[in-house]
Amino acid sequence: NMMSSGIRSIEFDDFAAGVKAVLTGAEPAVSFQEAGQLLDKYFAELEAEQKAQAEAMSAAMREEGEAFLKMNAEKEGVVTLPSGLQYKVITEGSGKKPSATSQVKCHYEGTFLNGAKFDSSYDRNEPAVFGLNQVIAGWTEGVQLMSEGSKYEFYIPYNLAYGEHGAPGAIPPYAALKFVVELIEVL
């Protein structure tokens, strides 16, 4: 499929002439070597354009996250830790606190800064069970602050979330994220 390979337009007369030359055995207007060089040049330019677009989107995502976290730090009830992780207590529990290697059972909802939801255990009607050493750094640090029964909102800078590469297909590079986390049980 030409569209999926990045070819957005084609000169149909030239294309038809090339196909006709191949099918009839005539001498094409452009040699196979020249055609290969033209395609190599085209795809190199396309790759450079896509890379520039991705870098611009990454820079915008990073700036958006930094601006949000700076403004969010001024809000009442929001605590900013030295790592840059921010949190707000919604409900304070009184049960056990986990360590960095604890297995925990949590309900959570993850959203982008614009409020778009990307994951939710609530939607699945089943809490998640995981080791705090098997999740993003913002979760490892943040959930340790909680006691069983607590519900916090975390504001996680990109470097404590999915970093400069993101999670392909799910989380863009440099994305700061919001999570509402309810610590049900330390296992």
Per-region residue spans from a language model:
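Cross-family detector of peptidyl-prolyl cis-trans isomerase
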Residues: 1-187
